[in-house]
């Protein structure tokens, strides 16, 4: 339950952050960007908590997330307004004017995403980078309630990690995102890459839809998903999918 609450809070914060960034996003773009932006913001907040020597517990990270959400609400209300968040009938034009080709493409996109998401959540992390660094560091950070001072970084315990190329030199944000779900009680970190890919697909379609017709946007999205590496990206790699999603967006 805490994991679901944390993910919802992260998405809502990301949704508000799109309102801070600009007012011309479509709802498809806002939804697609909500999780990547929200998780980026959440990991920054967790890093700040760690710098202030506040233990990373479910209470502290959710409380900090709630404070961040309230702050974003204030900024949007004070400086941007909520007019751009209004839901109008024009947003349903794609469905009202749907053609058979577009509907079939959307069904195929949904099936490919379901296949990818299911496989991602079923198989545990298996790639070397995750097991040697990202996933392991996230799990240990959740157990130690800190990233900077975690036991794996102890020179006496693990001297090799301080050598050139050691995982201690990696930017902590991927590991922090994994630690976030582990702190909230998740059994695996695979929900992060699975959701990253899901929201990336939504944002990809939304950005294309802004500049092209709905059928072309759906066809291009399907072609992107069916590329050999992208078809099972999040189910096979728990690290690269996050960087790829953010770079493309």
Please place each PLM-identified region on the residue numbering:
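Extracytoplasmic catalytic/substrate-binding loops of multi-pass membrane glycan-assembly enzymes
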Residues: 123-137, 143-176
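Transmembrane-helix signature of membrane-embedded glycosylation machinery that interfaces
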Residues: 17, 48, 181, 204-213
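Transmembrane signal-anchor helices characteristic of membrane glycosylation enzymes that use polyprenol
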Residues: 100-128
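Membrane-embedded, hydrophobic transmembrane alpha-helices
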Residues: 1-94
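Membrane-embedded glycan-lipid processing machinery
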Residues: 166, 170, 178-181, 188-196, ...
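Conserved small/polar residues in nucleotide/adenosyl-binding loops
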Residues: 247-249
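Membrane-interface helix caps and helix-loop-helix hairpins in membrane proteins
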Residues: 52-55, 121-123, 230-238
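Transmembrane-helix signature of polytopic, membrane-embedded enzymes
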Residues: 28-33, 186-188, 204-226
